[in-house]
Amino acid sequence: MSHGQPPPGSSMYGFGAMGMGSGMGSGMGSGMGTGMGTGMGTGMSASQMTSDPQDMMSLLDTSVFPGFDGMSMSLDVGDSMSNPFTPVSVPPPLPAGNAGPSHVGVCGGHGAPDQLFSPDDLIATSMSSAGPMIATPTTTTSGPSGGPSSGGGSTLTEFTKRRNWPAKVVEELQDWEHILDANGRIKHVSPSVEPLTGYKPPEIIDLFLRDLIHPDDVGVFTAELNEAIATGSQLRLFYRFRKKDGNWTIFETVGHAHIAAAKFAPNPQNQSPFCQAVFMMARPYPTKNAGLLDSFLEHKIENERLKRRIAELRREEQEEQEESHRTWRMSQEGRSDVTPSDDTATQMGMTPFYIPMNAQADVMMPPPSQPASSLNIALTRENLEGIAGSRPDSIREKMLRYEGNHADTIEMLTGLKYQEGERSHGITTGNASPTLIKGDAGIAIPLDRDPRTGEKKKKIKVAEEYVCTDCGTLDSPEWRKGPSGPKTLCNACGLRWAKKEKKKNANNNNNGGGIGGHNDIHTPMGDHMG
Protein backbone atom coordinates (compact mmCIF):
# COMPACT_ATOMS: atom_id res chain seq x y z
CA MET A 1 0.00 0.00 0.00
CA SER A 2 1.54 3.24 -1.18
CA HIS A 3 0.81 6.68 0.09
CA GLY A 4 0.73 9.40 -2.50
CA GLN A 5 -1.51 11.97 -4.01
CA PRO A 6 -4.79 10.37 -5.06
CA PRO A 7 -5.78 10.66 -8.75
CA PRO A 8 -8.62 13.01 -9.61
CA GLY A 9 -12.05 11.56 -9.28
CA SER A 10 -15.18 11.82 -11.32
CA SER A 11 -16.60 14.64 -9.26
CA MET A 12 -13.50 16.34 -8.12
CA TYR A 13 -15.11 19.62 -7.23
CA GLY A 14 -18.45 18.28 -6.14
CA PHE A 15 -19.65 18.16 -2.53
CA GLY A 16 -22.08 15.72 -1.12
CA ALA A 17 -24.08 15.65 2.09
CA MET A 18 -21.91 15.94 5.16
CA GLY A 19 -23.10 15.86 8.74
CA MET A 20 -21.16 16.77 11.85
CA GLY A 21 -20.21 13.75 13.89
CA SER A 22 -20.32 13.20 17.58
CA GLY A 23 -16.61 13.55 18.29
CA MET A 24 -14.80 16.81 17.56
CA GLY A 25 -11.52 15.51 18.84
CA SER A 26 -11.95 12.30 16.91
CA GLY A 27 -11.08 13.55 13.46
CA MET A 28 -12.68 15.38 10.58
CA GLY A 29 -14.41 12.57 8.77
CA SER A 30 -14.73 8.88 8.40
CA GLY A 31 -13.22 9.06 4.98
CA MET A 32 -10.20 10.96 6.22
CA GLY A 33 -9.07 8.01 8.28
CA THR A 34 -5.50 9.13 8.92
CA GLY A 35 -5.44 8.16 12.60
CA MET A 36 -7.50 11.17 13.74
CA GLY A 37 -10.13 9.03 15.40
CA THR A 38 -13.54 7.89 14.42
CA GLY A 39 -14.30 11.01 12.44
CA MET A 40 -17.32 13.07 11.93
CA GLY A 41 -19.90 10.54 10.91
CA THR A 42 -22.31 11.15 8.07
CA GLY A 43 -26.00 11.45 8.30
CA MET A 44 -26.01 12.86 11.87
CA SER A 45 -28.75 15.34 12.55
CA ALA A 46 -28.56 18.34 14.86
CA SER A 47 -30.87 16.66 17.37
CA GLN A 48 -28.50 13.72 17.58
CA MET A 49 -25.52 16.00 18.06
CA THR A 50 -27.06 17.83 20.96
CA SER A 51 -27.82 14.58 22.77
CA ASP A 52 -24.29 14.56 24.17
CA PRO A 53 -23.76 17.50 26.54
CA GLN A 54 -19.98 17.14 26.33
CA ASP A 55 -19.90 17.40 22.52
CA MET A 56 -18.58 20.83 21.56
CA MET A 57 -19.68 20.41 17.96
CA SER A 58 -23.30 20.13 19.02
CA LEU A 59 -23.38 23.92 19.26
CA LEU A 60 -22.96 24.25 15.49
CA ASP A 61 -25.82 24.25 13.06
CA THR A 62 -25.36 21.74 10.23
CA SER A 63 -27.62 23.67 7.92
CA VAL A 64 -24.83 26.15 7.13
CA PHE A 65 -22.58 23.44 5.71
CA PRO A 66 -23.12 22.28 2.11
CA GLY A 67 -23.15 18.60 1.51
CA PHE A 68 -20.23 16.59 0.13
CA ASP A 69 -20.65 13.98 -2.50
CA GLY A 70 -19.38 10.46 -2.30
CA MET A 71 -15.86 11.29 -3.49
CA SER A 72 -13.20 9.14 -1.94
CA MET A 73 -10.86 11.29 0.13
CA SER A 74 -8.62 8.43 1.16
CA LEU A 75 -4.89 8.74 0.62
CA ASP A 76 -4.68 5.12 -0.44
CA VAL A 77 -3.89 5.02 -4.16
CA GLY A 78 -5.05 1.46 -4.34
CA ASP A 79 -8.63 2.54 -4.12
CA SER A 80 -10.51 2.56 -7.39
CA MET A 81 -11.69 5.99 -8.45
CA SER A 82 -14.66 4.47 -10.15
CA ASN A 83 -16.04 3.12 -6.93
CA PRO A 84 -16.91 5.97 -4.61
CA PHE A 85 -16.01 5.54 -0.95
CA THR A 86 -18.93 4.76 1.31
CA PRO A 87 -18.60 6.58 4.64
CA VAL A 88 -18.96 4.55 7.79
CA SER A 89 -21.43 5.97 10.22
CA VAL A 90 -20.39 6.32 13.84
CA PRO A 91 -22.89 4.87 16.29
CA PRO A 92 -24.93 7.60 17.92
CA PRO A 93 -24.07 8.48 21.50
CA LEU A 94 -25.94 6.78 24.29
CA PRO A 95 -29.06 8.50 25.51
CA ALA A 96 -28.69 10.56 28.65
CA GLY A 97 -31.03 8.28 30.55
CA ASN A 98 -29.04 5.10 29.96
CA ALA A 99 -25.56 6.37 30.70
CA GLY A 100 -24.05 9.06 32.81
CA PRO A 101 -22.22 12.09 31.44
CA SER A 102 -19.42 11.01 29.16
CA HIS A 103 -16.26 12.73 28.04
CA VAL A 104 -14.77 12.67 24.59
CA GLY A 105 -11.41 10.97 24.74
CA VAL A 106 -8.41 11.16 22.48
CA CYS A 107 -9.58 8.19 20.51
CA GLY A 108 -13.11 9.42 20.13
CA GLY A 109 -14.49 7.35 22.96
CA HIS A 110 -16.94 8.47 25.53
CA GLY A 111 -15.26 7.30 28.71
CA ALA A 112 -15.09 8.29 32.30
CA PRO A 113 -13.17 11.44 33.27
CA ASP A 114 -9.42 10.99 33.58
CA GLN A 115 -9.78 7.53 32.09
CA LEU A 116 -6.58 5.90 30.90
CA PHE A 117 -6.50 4.53 27.36
CA SER A 118 -5.48 1.10 26.30
CA PRO A 119 -2.33 0.57 24.21
CA ASP A 120 -4.47 -0.31 21.22
CA ASP A 121 -6.12 3.09 21.28
CA LEU A 122 -2.76 4.85 21.53
CA ILE A 123 -1.40 2.85 18.61
CA ALA A 124 -4.45 3.69 16.56
CA THR A 125 -3.90 7.36 17.27
CA SER A 126 -0.22 7.32 16.34
CA MET A 127 -0.71 5.52 13.03
CA SER A 128 -1.44 8.60 10.95
CA SER A 129 -0.42 7.08 7.61
CA ALA A 130 -2.07 3.70 7.81
CA GLY A 131 -5.00 4.53 5.60
CA PRO A 132 -8.61 4.92 6.61
CA MET A 133 -9.12 3.71 10.16
CA ILE A 134 -12.29 3.85 12.15
CA ALA A 135 -11.62 3.79 15.88
CA THR A 136 -14.33 2.21 17.95
CA PRO A 137 -15.55 4.54 20.68
CA THR A 138 -15.07 3.10 24.14
CA THR A 139 -18.07 3.70 26.30
CA THR A 140 -18.68 2.76 29.89
CA THR A 141 -21.64 0.49 30.08
CA SER A 142 -24.17 1.08 32.74
CA GLY A 143 -26.37 -1.24 34.69
CA PRO A 144 -30.11 -1.05 35.21
CA SER A 145 -29.71 1.70 37.81
CA GLY A 146 -27.70 3.94 35.54
CA GLY A 147 -24.40 3.35 37.36
CA PRO A 148 -21.33 1.49 36.15
CA SER A 149 -21.75 -2.21 35.79
CA SER A 150 -19.51 -4.85 37.29
CA GLY A 151 -17.42 -4.92 34.15
CA GLY A 152 -16.75 -1.16 34.26
CA GLY A 153 -14.73 -1.27 37.52
CA SER A 154 -15.55 -0.12 41.02
CA THR A 155 -15.37 3.42 42.38
CA LEU A 156 -12.08 2.64 44.08
CA THR A 157 -10.61 1.47 40.78
CA GLU A 158 -11.80 4.62 39.03
CA PHE A 159 -10.32 6.78 41.81
CA THR A 160 -6.94 5.08 41.67
CA LYS A 161 -6.81 5.70 37.90
CA ARG A 162 -6.76 9.44 38.45
CA ARG A 163 -3.59 11.39 38.35
CA ASN A 164 -1.86 12.13 41.70
CA TRP A 165 -4.46 10.22 43.68
CA PRO A 166 -1.96 9.35 46.47
CA ALA A 167 -1.31 13.05 47.02
CA LYS A 168 -5.04 13.70 47.31
CA VAL A 169 -5.30 11.00 49.97
CA VAL A 170 -2.46 12.55 51.96
CA GLU A 171 -4.05 15.99 51.77
CA GLU A 172 -7.27 14.70 53.30
CA LEU A 173 -5.57 13.07 56.29
CA GLN A 174 -6.34 14.66 59.64
CA ASP A 175 -3.21 13.20 61.24
CA TRP A 176 0.17 14.82 60.86
CA GLU A 177 2.22 12.90 58.31
CA HIS A 178 5.91 13.86 58.14
CA ILE A 179 9.06 12.42 56.62
CA LEU A 180 12.47 12.71 58.26
CA ASP A 181 15.91 11.99 56.95
CA ALA A 182 18.37 9.75 58.74
CA ASN A 183 19.50 12.68 60.91
CA GLY A 184 15.99 13.55 62.09
CA ARG A 185 15.54 16.62 59.88
CA ILE A 186 12.01 17.27 58.61
CA LYS A 187 11.85 16.94 54.83
CA HIS A 188 8.13 16.78 54.19
CA VAL A 189 4.95 17.47 56.15
CA SER A 190 1.28 17.09 55.28
CA PRO A 191 -1.04 20.13 55.18
CA SER A 192 -2.65 18.98 58.45
CA VAL A 193 0.40 20.25 60.36
CA GLU A 194 -1.02 23.78 60.44
CA PRO A 195 -4.30 23.07 62.32
CA LEU A 196 -2.49 20.72 64.73
CA THR A 197 0.67 22.70 65.53
CA GLY A 198 0.15 26.18 64.09
CA TYR A 199 3.20 25.90 61.82
CA LYS A 200 2.82 26.25 58.08
CA PRO A 201 4.67 23.62 56.00
CA PRO A 202 7.40 26.03 54.77
CA GLU A 203 8.08 27.15 58.35
CA ILE A 204 8.83 23.68 59.65
CA ILE A 205 10.70 22.21 56.68
CA ASP A 206 14.44 21.56 57.26
CA LEU A 207 14.08 21.84 61.04
CA PHE A 208 15.24 19.10 63.37
CA LEU A 209 12.25 17.48 64.99
CA ARG A 210 14.09 17.09 68.29
CA ASP A 211 14.37 20.89 68.53
CA LEU A 212 10.57 21.10 68.74
CA ILE A 213 10.19 18.28 71.28
CA HIS A 214 10.19 18.80 75.04
CA PRO A 215 13.72 18.48 76.50
CA ASP A 216 12.60 15.67 78.80
CA ASP A 217 11.37 13.64 75.81
CA VAL A 218 14.29 14.22 73.44
CA GLY A 219 16.27 11.29 74.85
CA VAL A 220 13.43 8.82 74.37
CA PHE A 221 12.74 10.12 70.86
CA THR A 222 16.39 9.87 69.80
CA ALA A 223 16.75 6.35 71.18
CA GLU A 224 13.58 5.11 69.47
CA LEU A 225 14.56 6.74 66.17
CA ASN A 226 18.05 5.22 66.17
CA GLU A 227 16.68 1.80 67.07
CA ALA A 228 14.12 1.94 64.24
CA ILE A 229 16.85 2.92 61.76
CA ALA A 230 19.26 0.23 62.96
CA THR A 231 16.81 -2.67 63.20
CA GLY A 232 14.14 -1.64 60.68
CA SER A 233 11.44 -2.16 63.28
CA GLN A 234 8.40 0.03 63.75
CA LEU A 235 8.60 2.77 66.35
CA ARG A 236 5.79 4.01 68.57
CA LEU A 237 6.21 6.67 71.22
CA PHE A 238 4.61 9.66 72.91
CA TYR A 239 6.28 13.05 73.14
CA ARG A 240 5.41 16.63 73.97
CA PHE A 241 5.57 18.98 71.00
CA ARG A 242 5.92 22.76 71.21
CA LYS A 243 3.31 24.48 69.08
CA LYS A 244 3.77 27.84 67.42
CA ASP A 245 1.97 29.68 70.23
CA GLY A 246 4.40 28.22 72.78
CA ASN A 247 2.01 25.71 74.33
CA TRP A 248 2.80 22.01 74.59
CA THR A 249 0.69 19.25 73.16
CA ILE A 250 1.12 15.49 73.38
CA PHE A 251 1.47 13.49 70.16
CA GLU A 252 1.17 9.76 69.69
CA THR A 253 3.59 8.87 66.89
CA VAL A 254 4.12 5.71 64.87
CA GLY A 255 6.55 5.24 62.02
CA HIS A 256 9.19 3.14 60.35
CA ALA A 257 12.49 3.64 58.57
CA HIS A 258 12.77 3.11 54.82
CA ILE A 259 15.90 1.05 54.17
CA ALA A 260 17.08 1.49 50.57
CA ALA A 261 19.48 -0.65 48.62
CA ALA A 262 23.15 0.31 48.30
CA LYS A 263 22.80 1.28 44.65
CA PHE A 264 20.60 4.23 45.64
CA ALA A 265 23.19 5.65 48.01
CA PRO A 266 24.56 9.08 47.09
CA ASN A 267 28.03 7.80 47.92
CA PRO A 268 29.16 5.30 45.26
CA GLN A 269 31.54 3.70 47.73
CA ASN A 270 28.65 2.63 49.94
CA GLN A 271 28.10 -1.10 49.55
CA SER A 272 25.48 -1.67 52.26
CA PRO A 273 21.80 -0.75 52.59
CA PHE A 274 21.16 2.61 54.21
CA CYS A 275 18.28 4.57 55.71
CA GLN A 276 16.85 6.80 53.04
CA ALA A 277 13.99 8.30 55.08
CA VAL A 278 11.81 7.78 58.12
CA PHE A 279 8.07 7.92 57.60
CA MET A 280 6.11 9.00 60.68
CA MET A 281 2.46 9.67 61.46
CA ALA A 282 1.39 11.62 64.57
CA ARG A 283 -1.94 12.46 66.12
CA PRO A 284 -2.87 14.40 69.28
CA TYR A 285 -3.18 12.38 72.47
CA PRO A 286 -5.57 11.93 73.94
CA THR A 287 -8.27 12.39 71.39
CA LYS A 288 -11.76 13.43 72.44
CA ASN A 289 -13.02 9.85 72.58
CA ALA A 290 -9.91 8.66 74.40
CA GLY A 291 -10.31 11.47 76.94
CA LEU A 292 -13.90 10.46 77.60
CA LEU A 293 -12.85 6.83 77.98
CA ASP A 294 -10.05 7.74 80.41
CA SER A 295 -12.44 9.87 82.44
CA PHE A 296 -14.96 7.04 82.57
CA LEU A 297 -12.30 4.56 83.69
CA GLU A 298 -11.09 6.93 86.39
CA HIS A 299 -14.61 7.31 87.75
CA LYS A 300 -15.11 3.55 87.56
CA ILE A 301 -11.91 2.88 89.52
CA GLU A 302 -12.84 5.48 92.12
CA ASN A 303 -16.29 3.93 92.45
CA GLU A 304 -14.84 0.46 92.98
CA ARG A 305 -12.41 1.78 95.57
CA LEU A 306 -15.23 3.46 97.49
CA LYS A 307 -17.32 0.29 97.37
CA ARG A 308 -14.46 -1.76 98.80
CA ARG A 309 -13.84 0.82 101.52
CA ILE A 310 -17.51 0.85 102.51
CA ALA A 311 -17.56 -2.96 102.57
CA GLU A 312 -14.52 -2.97 104.87
CA LEU A 313 -16.17 -0.46 107.20
CA ARG A 314 -19.36 -2.50 107.32
CA ARG A 315 -17.38 -5.66 108.02
CA GLU A 316 -15.52 -3.96 110.86
CA GLU A 317 -18.78 -2.62 112.25
CA GLN A 318 -20.36 -6.07 112.11
CA GLU A 319 -17.38 -7.57 113.94
CA GLU A 320 -17.65 -4.93 116.65
CA GLN A 321 -21.37 -5.58 117.02
CA GLU A 322 -20.74 -9.30 117.33
CA GLU A 323 -18.10 -8.60 119.95
CA SER A 324 -20.50 -6.40 121.91
CA HIS A 325 -23.23 -9.07 121.79
CA ARG A 326 -20.76 -11.71 122.90
CA THR A 327 -19.68 -9.57 125.83
CA TRP A 328 -23.29 -8.88 126.76
CA ARG A 329 -24.09 -12.60 126.76
CA MET A 330 -21.07 -13.28 128.95
CA SER A 331 -22.22 -10.58 131.35
CA GLN A 332 -25.68 -12.13 131.41
CA GLU A 333 -24.23 -15.53 132.19
CA GLY A 334 -22.14 -13.94 134.94
CA ARG A 335 -25.23 -12.23 136.37
CA SER A 336 -26.97 -15.57 136.79
CA ASP A 337 -24.26 -16.59 139.29
CA VAL A 338 -24.40 -13.33 141.28
CA THR A 339 -25.87 -13.58 144.81
CA PRO A 340 -28.69 -11.31 145.96
CA SER A 341 -26.17 -9.35 147.96
CA ASP A 342 -24.36 -8.58 144.72
CA ASP A 343 -27.60 -7.34 143.22
CA THR A 344 -28.19 -5.13 146.22
CA ALA A 345 -24.66 -3.83 146.02
CA THR A 346 -25.19 -3.08 142.37
CA GLN A 347 -28.32 -1.18 143.30
CA MET A 348 -26.23 0.91 145.67
CA GLY A 349 -23.87 1.88 142.87
CA MET A 350 -21.06 -0.58 143.58
CA THR A 351 -20.01 -3.22 141.10
CA PRO A 352 -20.00 -6.86 142.18
CA PHE A 353 -16.26 -7.04 141.55
CA TYR A 354 -15.41 -4.35 144.10
CA ILE A 355 -17.85 -4.95 146.98
CA PRO A 356 -16.26 -4.36 150.38
CA MET A 357 -16.30 -7.21 152.85
CA ASN A 358 -18.41 -5.38 155.44
CA ALA A 359 -21.01 -4.41 152.89
CA GLN A 360 -21.15 -7.98 151.61
CA ALA A 361 -21.71 -9.29 155.15
CA ASP A 362 -24.49 -6.83 155.81
CA VAL A 363 -26.43 -7.56 152.63
CA MET A 364 -25.82 -11.28 152.38
CA MET A 365 -29.47 -12.12 153.07
CA PRO A 366 -32.24 -9.83 151.92
CA PRO A 367 -34.88 -8.91 154.45
CA PRO A 368 -38.07 -10.95 154.41
CA SER A 369 -40.13 -7.91 153.49
CA GLN A 370 -38.24 -7.46 150.23
CA PRO A 371 -39.98 -9.24 147.37
CA ALA A 372 -38.06 -11.68 145.25
CA SER A 373 -38.98 -9.74 142.10
CA SER A 374 -36.76 -6.88 143.22
CA LEU A 375 -33.77 -8.87 141.99
CA ASN A 376 -34.86 -8.15 138.41
CA ILE A 377 -34.00 -4.48 138.87
CA ALA A 378 -30.37 -5.33 138.16
CA LEU A 379 -31.35 -6.44 134.62
CA THR A 380 -32.33 -2.96 133.54
CA ARG A 381 -30.39 -1.38 130.72
CA GLU A 382 -29.01 1.37 132.95
CA ASN A 383 -27.43 -1.17 135.29
CA LEU A 384 -26.04 -3.17 132.42
CA GLU A 385 -24.50 -0.04 130.93
CA GLY A 386 -23.06 0.85 134.30
CA ILE A 387 -21.41 -2.56 134.56
CA ALA A 388 -20.01 -2.32 131.05
CA GLY A 389 -18.86 1.26 131.56
CA SER A 390 -16.98 0.44 134.78
CA ARG A 391 -14.76 -2.05 133.04
CA PRO A 392 -11.53 -0.79 131.51
CA ASP A 393 -11.54 -0.51 127.69
CA SER A 394 -15.21 -1.33 127.40
CA ILE A 395 -17.08 -1.90 124.18
CA ARG A 396 -18.62 1.54 124.53
CA GLU A 397 -15.19 3.15 124.54
CA LYS A 398 -14.10 1.07 121.58
CA MET A 399 -17.14 2.19 119.61
CA LEU A 400 -16.52 5.80 120.52
CA ARG A 401 -12.91 5.48 119.44
CA TYR A 402 -13.48 3.62 116.17
CA GLU A 403 -16.76 5.08 115.00
CA GLY A 404 -15.35 8.59 114.94
CA ASN A 405 -12.62 7.49 112.55
CA HIS A 406 -15.08 5.60 110.37
CA ALA A 407 -17.41 8.57 110.17
CA ASP A 408 -14.58 10.87 109.20
CA THR A 409 -13.42 8.44 106.54
CA ILE A 410 -16.90 8.04 105.09
CA GLU A 411 -17.45 11.79 105.05
CA MET A 412 -14.14 12.27 103.30
CA LEU A 413 -14.77 9.59 100.66
CA THR A 414 -18.46 10.04 99.98
CA GLY A 415 -19.14 13.61 101.04
CA LEU A 416 -22.12 12.44 103.08
CA LYS A 417 -22.77 13.92 106.51
CA TYR A 418 -22.62 10.58 108.21
CA GLN A 419 -22.48 12.00 111.73
CA GLU A 420 -25.91 13.57 111.36
CA GLY A 421 -27.54 10.17 111.01
CA GLU A 422 -29.02 7.82 113.53
CA ARG A 423 -25.68 6.61 114.88
CA SER A 424 -24.58 10.12 115.78
CA HIS A 425 -27.55 10.48 118.10
CA GLY A 426 -26.61 7.29 119.88
CA ILE A 427 -23.00 8.41 120.29
CA THR A 428 -23.80 11.89 121.57
CA THR A 429 -26.22 10.55 124.21
CA GLY A 430 -23.51 8.31 125.59
CA ASN A 431 -25.40 5.04 125.07
CA ALA A 432 -23.69 1.81 124.16
CA SER A 433 -26.41 1.03 121.62
CA PRO A 434 -26.41 3.84 119.05
CA THR A 435 -30.00 3.21 117.93
CA LEU A 436 -31.50 3.44 121.42
CA ILE A 437 -32.21 6.15 123.97
CA LYS A 438 -32.88 5.92 127.64
CA GLY A 439 -36.04 4.02 128.43
CA ASP A 440 -37.65 2.14 131.28
CA ALA A 441 -36.79 -1.43 132.37
CA GLY A 442 -34.51 -2.04 129.39
CA ILE A 443 -37.22 -1.46 126.77
CA ALA A 444 -35.68 0.23 123.75
CA ILE A 445 -37.49 3.32 122.47
CA PRO A 446 -36.33 4.60 119.08
CA LEU A 447 -35.82 8.29 118.54
CA ASP A 448 -38.56 8.59 115.97
CA ARG A 449 -41.08 6.66 118.03
CA ASP A 450 -44.53 8.21 118.35
CA PRO A 451 -45.23 8.90 122.06
CA ARG A 452 -48.89 7.98 121.53
CA THR A 453 -48.19 4.37 120.64
CA GLY A 454 -51.04 3.07 122.77
CA GLU A 455 -53.64 5.13 120.95
CA LYS A 456 -55.14 3.99 117.73
CA LYS A 457 -53.76 6.07 114.93
CA LYS A 458 -56.34 7.88 112.94
CA LYS A 459 -56.17 7.88 109.22
CA ILE A 460 -54.69 11.17 108.17
CA LYS A 461 -56.35 12.72 105.19
CA VAL A 462 -53.70 13.85 102.78
CA ALA A 463 -54.37 17.28 101.41
CA GLU A 464 -54.60 17.31 97.65
CA GLU A 465 -52.45 19.74 95.79
CA TYR A 466 -53.98 21.86 93.06
CA VAL A 467 -52.54 24.44 90.74
CA CYS A 468 -54.38 27.32 89.13
CA THR A 469 -54.34 27.01 85.36
CA ASP A 470 -54.69 30.79 85.00
CA CYS A 471 -52.23 32.38 87.44
CA GLY A 472 -50.27 29.25 88.44
CA THR A 473 -50.67 29.69 92.19
CA LEU A 474 -50.54 26.69 94.52
CA ASP A 475 -52.07 28.31 97.60
CA SER A 476 -55.75 29.16 97.61
CA PRO A 477 -58.40 28.92 100.36
CA GLU A 478 -60.83 27.47 97.87
CA TRP A 479 -60.57 25.95 94.43
CA ARG A 480 -63.24 26.67 91.85
CA LYS A 481 -64.41 25.36 88.55
CA GLY A 482 -62.75 26.59 85.39
CA PRO A 483 -62.79 25.93 81.66
CA SER A 484 -60.59 22.86 82.21
CA GLY A 485 -62.83 21.27 84.82
CA PRO A 486 -63.58 21.46 88.54
CA LYS A 487 -60.95 22.76 90.94
CA THR A 488 -58.70 24.06 88.21
CA LEU A 489 -58.84 27.76 89.18
CA CYS A 490 -58.02 29.50 92.42
CA ASN A 491 -60.65 31.49 94.31
CA ALA A 492 -59.94 34.83 92.61
CA CYS A 493 -59.52 33.45 89.09
CA GLY A 494 -62.61 31.25 89.50
CA LEU A 495 -64.82 34.17 90.54
CA ARG A 496 -63.50 36.28 87.69
CA TRP A 497 -64.09 33.51 85.17
CA ALA A 498 -67.59 32.82 86.49
CA LYS A 499 -68.53 36.49 86.21
CA LYS A 500 -67.21 36.60 82.65
CA GLU A 501 -69.17 33.50 81.68
CA LYS A 502 -72.31 34.84 83.32
CA LYS A 503 -72.04 38.10 81.40
CA LYS A 504 -71.40 36.22 78.16
CA ASN A 505 -74.47 34.06 78.67
CA ALA A 506 -76.58 37.12 79.42
CA ASN A 507 -75.47 38.79 76.21
CA ASN A 508 -76.24 35.67 74.22
CA ASN A 509 -79.74 35.54 75.71
CA ASN A 510 -80.40 39.17 74.86
CA ASN A 511 -79.18 38.75 71.30
CA GLY A 512 -81.22 35.64 70.81
CA GLY A 513 -84.41 37.27 72.17
CA GLY A 514 -83.98 40.39 70.00
CA ILE A 515 -83.85 38.33 66.84
CA GLY A 516 -86.89 36.45 67.91
CA GLY A 517 -84.98 33.29 68.12
CA HIS A 518 -84.47 30.76 70.82
CA ASN A 519 -83.96 31.67 74.48
CA ASP A 520 -81.94 29.17 76.42
CA ILE A 521 -82.06 28.97 80.16
CA HIS A 522 -78.47 29.02 81.43
CA THR A 523 -77.55 28.13 84.92
CA PRO A 524 -75.04 30.55 86.48
CA MET A 525 -71.57 29.12 86.54
CA GLY A 526 -71.13 30.06 90.18
CA ASP A 527 -73.72 27.44 91.16
CA HIS A 528 -71.58 24.65 89.75
CA MET A 529 -68.31 25.73 91.25
CA GLY A 530 -66.89 23.58 93.97
Curated annotation (Swiss-Prot):
Signal peptide: none annotated. The keyword Nucleotide-binding does not apply. GO terms for cellular component: nucleus. InterPro entries: PAS, PAS-like_dom_sf, PAS_fold_3, Znf_GATA, Znf_NHR/GATA. It holds the Pfam family PAS_3. Residues 134-158, 315-343, 504-530 are annotated as: Disordered. One of its GO terms (molecular function) is transcription cis-regulatory region binding. May function as a transcription factor involved in light regulation. Binds and affects blue light regulation of the al-3 gene. Wc-1 and wc-2 interact via homologous PAS domains, bind to promoters of light regulated genes such as frq, and activate transcription. May bind directly to frq. Heterodimer of wc-1 and wc-2 (Potential). Binds to DNA. This is White collar 2 protein. It comes from Neurospora crassa (strain ATCC 24698 / 74-OR23-1A / CBS 708.71 / DSM 1257 / FGSC 987).
